[in-house]
Amino acid sequence: MAMGLVGQKIGMTRLISDDGSITPVSVIKIELNRIVQTKTVDTNGYSAIQVTTGVKVNKKGEAKVHRVPAAIKGHYAKTSQEIGLGLWEFRVEADEITDATSVDISLFSAGHYVNVVGRSKGKGFQGGVKRHNFQMQDATHGNSISHRAIGSTGQCQEPGRVFKGKKMAGHMGNEQVTQECLKIVKVDSERNIIFVKGSIPGATKGFVKISLSSKKNKINQEVSKNIQNQATNEVVLN
């Protein structure tokens, strides 16, 4: 997995191009990601970078740390970082680990393809029709109170039980969901906002993890190379 960033879902809108085409996009706010811990193979058994973002504050805007456990305070104190709104981890290669103390929105550019990981909206206890898209029974005369029933759940005497994993009614949503290969349409560095084509999981103000998609690695490398060439040309012209 490549290094990524943690952002906050703002909502959805649409972007209109010069030719009049409309693109639905998700808006993600990405504040500065501060590196809290660097994990190595020798110490932890794998290579990863742990980051945080934002600051816990009360309604008055004051730092809210009195309810933070001492162990968490000590964890942040090791790198002299301010206590954030959570901890997120990105698995990286050993050669990708640097001495940097933070990562910003400059990691992404328009044209990059990313994977977005978030927690889906909780729907509570739902029936088979909504949870698994089961077909409804007849809504006609003769069907009594069984319109949304799931039907048979198994055999009778043999095996005399319901098989594990049978699709039935139950809790729906509130689980980790990954949307892959979403294209970044626009990056607003001044406001720390990126616009990603399509929808992303989670509710408004929910946190999401964004990382470069390995399935589109060739395209991502070409985009990064073009940006570097443009920057080099600008330096030469100046």
UniProtKB/Swiss-Prot annotation:
Pfam families reported for this sequence: Ribosomal_L3
Residues that bear N5-methylglutamine: Q157
Keywords per UniProt: Methylation, Ribonucleoprotein, Ribosomal protein, RNA-binding, rRNA-binding
Processing after translation: Methylated by PrmB.
InterPro entries assigned: Ribosomal_uL3 (IPR000597), Ribosomal_uL3_bac/org-type (IPR019927), Ribosomal_uL3_CS (IPR019926), Transl_B-barrel_sf (IPR009000)
GO cellular component: cytosolic large ribosomal subunit
GO MF annotations, alphabetized: rRNA binding; structural constituent of ribosome
The keyword rRNA-binding appears for this protein: yes
GO biological process: translation
Record bears the keyword Transmembrane: no
Family the entry assigns: Belongs to the universal ribosomal protein uL3 family.
PANTHER family: 50S RIBOSOMAL PROTEIN L3, LARGE RIBOSOMAL SUBUNIT PROTEIN UL3C
Subunit architecture: Part of the 50S ribosomal subunit. Forms a cluster with proteins L14 and L19.
Function field: One of the primary rRNA binding proteins, it binds directly near the 3'-end of the 23S rRNA, where it nucleates assembly of the 50S subunit.
Protein name: Large ribosomal subunit protein uL3
Species this protein is from: Ruthia magnifica subsp. Calyptogena magnifica
Name of the gene encoding the protein in the UniProt record: rplC
